[in-house]
């Protein structure tokens, strides 16, 4: 590890990473849209639920494994599609993927990854998903879908909440310039900003549900819709055949003043009606909140920013440490609540807590 004292929680990982990263890179990762209210709310909202611990239950053997899209994972914490891992460590996504594989979980590879889909697939024997946008360029979309299938990727994540660029004031002050992802064709457009229709491979501001339906029809891989925050949109995802949804407000990076993702999770689960898996990201900094999310109906959760803190502090082993800290805290919470397996965690494990 790069620091003399090893972080013992994810908050300390962030503190250590802040000291190591250039200011503009730290701000890019940590920052959010406008006043960053949703960034903070995502984390704090979990305090609205409290545990109902049960005693005298056999917790001598704890099982943190579960299934996501039919595949077994050893930890109900997946790594979200976040672009540009090399901003935190020279090995970038290669280090992240090796860490995810060694911990038995999934890496969802961002459209803006610094590493090609092919090079990543060779780096470890783990589980990879590919994330993309509703691009204007259907030929490029089909190419990505075909490359994902050919290289053994297990699912497609389609990000739906990025049709218009956000205002991130930290980036404006720092005059931050993003680098192009490794998987775009030479001269292809970055999908960060809307442009006139037909202008290239950007994220399409004119995209509709027909675009998600087209992607679903264009691949045999499971399709997961990311960026859904209402029951109505969960129902529409089901109508076009999505296999899962990720309840996400993009970590508070696109639209400020939304509810926290955990605050809309129950609505999403109810709307899914058991037809799709419901996943969640946003504000995961403790193992205890992973258990709360599962109790509210999530199949599993994703982390985003913490993977960068792990990379910055210790590369591959830093990400392993981040995941293992969450594993340790999940185990403690499960044992203390009398829930020996992920499947034993249900709504009776928590209660809505009155405000302090």
Region annotations inferred by a language model:
Residues 1-73, 168, 175-207, 343-345, ...:
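An N-cap/entry alpha-helix motif that binds or orients negatively charged groups
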Residues 97-98, 119-123, 136-280, 287-309:
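Alpha/beta enzyme core
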Residues 299, 315-343, 350:
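Internal helix-turn-beta structural module
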Residues 78-84, 127-133, 196-198:
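Short, basic, glycine/proline-bearing loop/turn elements
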Residues 73-112, 117:
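Glycine-rich active-site/cofactor-binding loop and its immediate structural neighborhood
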Residues 104-109, 275-282:
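A short, small-residue-rich loop immediately preceding and capping a beta-strand
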Residues 42, 257-268, 311-331:
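C-terminal helical cap(s) of enzyme catalytic domains, especially alpha/beta-barrels
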Residues 101-123, 127-141:
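A gly/proline- and charged-residue-enriched helix-loop-helix capping module
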């Amino acid at each position: 590890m790069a620091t003399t004292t090893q972080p013992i929680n994810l908050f300390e990982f962030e503190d250590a990473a802040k000291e190591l990263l250039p200011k503009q890179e730290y701000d890019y990762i940590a920052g959010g849209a406008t006043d960053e209210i949703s960034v903070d709310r995502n984390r704090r909202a979990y305090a609205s639920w409290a545990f109902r611990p049960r005693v005298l239950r056999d917790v001598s053997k704890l099982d943190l494994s579960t299934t996501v899209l039919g595949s077994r994972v050893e930890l109900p914490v997946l790594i979200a599609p976040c672009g540009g891992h090399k901003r935190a460590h020279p090995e970038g996504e290669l280090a992240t993927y090796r860490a995810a594989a060694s911990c038995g979980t999934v890496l969802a590879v961002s459209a803006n990854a610094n590493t090609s889909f092919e090079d990543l697939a060779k780096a470890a024997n783990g589980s990879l998903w590919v994330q993309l946008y509703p691009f204007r360029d259907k030929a490029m979309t089909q190419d990505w879908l075909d490359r994902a299938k050919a290289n053994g990727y297990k699912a497609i994540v389609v990000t739906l909440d990025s049709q218009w660029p956000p205002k991130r004031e930290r980036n404006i002050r720092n005059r931050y310039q993003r680098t192009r992802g490794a998987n775009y064709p030479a001269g292809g457009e970055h999908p960060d900003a809307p442009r006139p229709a037909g202008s290239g491979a950007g994220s399409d501001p004119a995209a509709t549900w027909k675009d998600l339906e087209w992607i679903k029809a264009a691949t045999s891989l499971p399709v997961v819709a990311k960026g859904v925050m209402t029951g109505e949109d969960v129902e529409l995802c089901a109508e076009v055949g999505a296999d899962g949804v990720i309840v996400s407000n993009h970590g508070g990076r696109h639209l400020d003043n939304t509810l926290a993702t955990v605050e809309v999770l129950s609505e999403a689960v109810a709307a899914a009606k058991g037809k799709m898996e419901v996943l969640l990201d946003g504000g995961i900094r403790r193992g205890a909140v992973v258990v709360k999310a599962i109790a509210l109906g999530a199949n599993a959760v994703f982390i985003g920013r913490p993977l960068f803190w792990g990379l910055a502090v210790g590369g591959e082993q830093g990400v392993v440490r981040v995941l293992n800290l969450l594993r340790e805290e999940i185990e403690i919470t499960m044992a203390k609540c009398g829930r020996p397996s992920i499947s034993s965690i249900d709504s009776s494990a928590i209660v809505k807590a009155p405000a302090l």
